[in-house]
Swiss-Prot record:
One of its GO terms (molecular function) is ribosome binding. One of its GO terms (biological process) is protein insertion into mitochondrial membrane. The keyword Transit peptide applies. It comes from Homo sapiens (Human). It is found in: Mitochondrion matrix. One of its GO terms (cellular component) is mitochondrion. This is m-AAA protease-interacting protein 1, mitochondrial. It comes from the Eukaryota. Residues 1-96 form a transit peptide.
């Protein structure tokens, strides 16, 4: 438990974005909405969510299909959106002389359009308020969401590397035992796809919050978090049916193909008096990888 006390509490104490509908724009960038059919059945039925991505490098192609806009667009966000997410910096335009060569690896900016089921959003906010009111006065769903995002990146990386010994204090024993059998039998490219780089996580949402008591009177809270992330793992498209594929241009010549995958992690904590305040992962689902 010492390892969990050092790792998970650190993950679950930082700022995040609210799960309301968020629309971000960067200057002179077109917007494209990802069809909901590309999401997994679990996420569509339970959340009614969608995530859309549009590479900044594909701006020229989209400009031919969309009406011309002004040269500068303001950044739009909902009230209270953290500045770290709301202010997507635009890549500065730079001209090169004949003796100067452009960088070959430039970061590609993405536009994320998030849509949250309003009923689910209200329900999770009410339950988050109950946790704050009755269990933990320091609890914040926005801070928890950001911490869960960091925990997801850390745990998924260890999972892809089959470092199960380092997950013993972070993941429930019965869940870890089942994961060992599934992950070890996966091909290497599927294992690589399990790892989510925190910079490639494009959308995070609170799926559900459960508050319950067991027969002994112990108090538990379960929070289901859903993540969408890009991966460069070489996975045949016919293997992951329904997964979205993007071609991201790096620099002027290199083009990298990425796939949009989804995962669901359920975090659990016992709030019984006298019990250590440790969050553990009670369920791990990687759509189309761990089925």
């Amino acid at each position: 438990m010492a390892l969990a006390a050092r790792l998970l509490p650190q993950f679950l104490h930082s700022r995040s974005l609210p799960c309301g509908a968020v629309r971000l724009r960067t200057p002179a960038v077109a917007e494209v909405r990802l069809p909901s059919a590309t999401l997994c059945y679990f996420c569509r039925c339970r959340l009614g969510l969608g995530a859309a991505l549009f590479p900044r490098s594909a701006r020229a192609l989209a400009a031919s299909a969309l009406p011309a806009q002004g040269s500068r667009w303001p950044v739009l966000s909902s009230p209270g959106l953290p500045a770290a997410f709301a202010s997507f910096p635009a890549c500065p335009q730079r001209s090169y002389s004949t003796e100067e060569k452009p960088q070959q690896h430039q970061k590609t900016k993405m536009i994320v359009l998030g849509f949250s089921n309003p009923i689910n959003w209200v329900r999770t906010r009410i339950k988050a308020f109950l946790i704050w009111a009755y269990f933990d006065k320091e609890f914040s769903i926005t801070e928890f969401s950001e911490g869960a995002k960091q925990a997801f990146a850390h745990v998924s990386k260890l999972l892809s590397q089959c470092k199960f010994d380092l997950l013993e204090e972070l993941v429930a024993k019965e869940v870890l035992h089942a994961l060992k059998e599934k992950v070890t039998s996966l091909p290497d490219n599927h294992k690589n796809a399990l790892a989510a780089n925190i910079d490639e996580i494009v959308f995070t949402s609170t799926g559900d919050i459960s508050i319950y008591y067991d027969e002994k009177g112990r108090k538990f809270v379960n929070i289901l978090m859903c993540f969408w992330y890009l991966t460069s793992a070489n996975i045949p498209s016919e293997t992951l049916r329904g997964a979205s594929v993007f071609q991201v241009k790096l620099g002027n010549q290199n083009v990298e193909t990425k796939q949009l995958l989804s995962a669901s992690y359920e975090f659990q904590r016992e709030f019984t008096q006298g019990v250590k305040p440790d969050w553990t992962i009670a369920r791990i689902e990687h759509s189309k990888l761990l089925e």
